[in-house]
């Protein structure tokens, strides 16, 4: 059984091993694979594993030996699911492996803004504290989270984890969710989308990307938010109209934008968000803690093993 990993570097730059997969077949690992290389590299594979390499219908048609695609991520929009099913190829993903890490990153971004960590670190390096007349130095407002309203768009695994962390900070938690109110903890208030936009001091996005949620945060909806609101996106880049957000930041119609994802990855250096000092941007690292990648690595092998035993799990094209 030949197993080909097409873009292994992002999830495993060398600090993990593939011993669990190697027990299941011959493993060939490529750090990265371009569109021009993917057919040649996958043509003899029974199983391919990938993260962001695109597998469209045209590509799949050139891989008649392929039996299984294991996506090394939760999202599976990189594969044409319908075409794979038509061709008899099972496709699996890795759900919930990075819940804790993404929730942690969500609050890392929130705290970086409310406590102005980057600003004061730089001011300290510039000797502003060293030459200050007082025992402390601060020149910008700081925000306490207790009593502030955190709005959550989407209450899946990550959204619920974020809600629980917010509760420990003493925040008031409200959410726009498809779940029934009776299925929510009593301390989470279910509200409409417009209600969430209008009342949130901090709004964080944890909904899946779909036709309905593409550019969910656009110029119109930003206009419904508080001018001081902090918007956080650790979900999917295209949930947000980045040009509209950049304009709102520039016009002081939005307090801050924190994102670990962007509409194009890697982003263009011309992206208008890079010009805005109140845009706090990290390079899609929320999922990438060692612990989360270790869980990912193990579950990838478990998915392959289950497939080989005839009882596939985490199938996204049943």
Regions flagged by a language model, labelled:
Residues 159-160:
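N-terminal Rossmann-fold NAD(P) dinucleotide-binding loop
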Residues 1-92, 198, 218-220:
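An N-terminal-biased, well-structured beta-alpha scaffold segment characteristic
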Residues 155-156:
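Glycine-rich Rossmann-fold phosphate-binding loop(s) that bind the pyrophosphate
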């Amino acid at each position: 059984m030949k197993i080909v990993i097409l873009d292994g570097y992002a999830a495993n730059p060398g600090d993990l091993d593939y011993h669990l997969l190697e027990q299941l077949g011959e493993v060939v690992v490529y750090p990265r694979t371009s569109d021009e290389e993917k057919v040649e590299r996958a043509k003899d594979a029974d199983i391919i594993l990938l993260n962001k390499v695109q597998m469209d219908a045209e590509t799949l048609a050139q891989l008649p030996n392929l039996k299984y695609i294991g996506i090394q991520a939760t999202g599976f929009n990189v594969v044409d699911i319908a075409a794979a099913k038509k061709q008899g190829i099972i496709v699996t993903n890795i759900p919930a492996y990075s819940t804790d890490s993404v929730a942690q990153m969500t609050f890392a971004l929130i705290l970086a803004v409310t406590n102005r960590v980057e600003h004061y670190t730089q001011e300290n390096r510039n000797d502003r504290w060293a030459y200050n007349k007082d025992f402390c130095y601060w020149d910008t407002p700081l925000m306490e989270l207790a009593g502030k309203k955190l709005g959550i768009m989407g209450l899946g695994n990550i959204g619920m984890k974020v809600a629980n962390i917010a509760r420990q900070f003493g925040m008031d938690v409200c959410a726009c969710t498809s779940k029934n109110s009776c299925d929510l903890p009593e301390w989470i208030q279910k509200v409409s989308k417009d209600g969430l936009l209008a009342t949130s001091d901090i709004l964080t996005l944890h909904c899946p990307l779909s036709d309905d949620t593409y550019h969910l945060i656009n110029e119109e909806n930003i206009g419904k938010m508080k001018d001081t609101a902090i918007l956080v996106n650790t979900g999917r880049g295209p949930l947000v109209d980045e040009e509209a957000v950049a304009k709102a930041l520039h016009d002081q119609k939005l307090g801050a934008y924190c994102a670990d994802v962007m509409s194009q990855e890697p982003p263009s250096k011309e992206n208008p968000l890079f010009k805005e000092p109140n845009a706090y941007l990290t390079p899609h690292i929320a999922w990438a803690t060692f612990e989360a990648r270790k869980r990912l690595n193990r579950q990838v092998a478990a998915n392959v093993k289950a497939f080989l035993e005839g009882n596939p799990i985490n199938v996204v094209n049943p």
